[in-house]
Amino acid sequence: MAGKSSGDRRKPIRKGKDGKNAAPAKSVRVGVIDYKDVATLRKFISERGKIRALRITGVSVQEQRLIARAVKNAREMALLPYAGSGR
């Protein structure tokens, strides 16, 4: 396996018009994210209740930190659940 690397086996990223790969932060000004704005924060949380990675959401590192802090504050204030809705 002289020419093979682990990168050759990856699936290509599909970017369709269905909106699945659209970053939620592109339509939201991340500078105004507040822990009280639960509707906006839910765009950055998975069904299991985890904060989505910045490579999935398409935000910068600084914006990801703001989002993570806002989500954690909202969880502490019982505006968002710690765990998702379940299976």
From Swiss-Prot:
Name under which the protein is recorded: Small ribosomal subunit protein bS18
Role description: Binds as a heterodimer with protein bS6 to the central domain of the 16S rRNA, where it helps stabilize the platform of the 30S subunit.
Pfam families according to UniProt: Ribosomal_S18
Keyword tags: Ribonucleoprotein, Ribosomal protein, RNA-binding, rRNA-binding
Region described as Disordered: 1-24
GO CC annotations, alphabetized: cytosolic small ribosomal subunit
Basic and acidic residues: bias regions: 1-20
GO molecular function: small ribosomal subunit rRNA binding; structural constituent of ribosome
Family: Belongs to the bacterial ribosomal protein bS18 family.
BP GO annotations: translation
Domain of life: Bacteria
Subunit (UniProt): Part of the 30S ribosomal subunit. Forms a tight heterodimer with protein bS6.
